[in-house]
């Protein structure tokens, strides 16, 4: 008796699931792939809780020096407690694949673990991944080469996030 009830319940359940009236459909075209914050340049700003990425929706960067100029010229969004600790001047950046080199006139003023260095590293890593779509921002390593003093790096953006 128990077996009959179990079989009947299973058959009834299967019939209910397959008989819901939804007809199969073919492939539905949905247009272009999704886009949003994962594309485009982001500038990184400092806050008491760490670095925060700010997307630049209406700006285009043609090279890494353009990203540096944007970082120096763009005010952080108001009301979020974000600031820029980077004072630009005497920096130039070049990139190839996953490597970015920042050349500085004179000694580099950052310690390598400060938020100003993080702003530069993360902004340049993101810009390099936009300029070379085969490169992931997480894989970019930035090295600072001052005209005076020792090189600093290579540094990755992840070292500065989540602090």
Kindly give the residue locations of the regions a language model identified.
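Bimodal "functional hotspot" detector
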Residues: 2-163
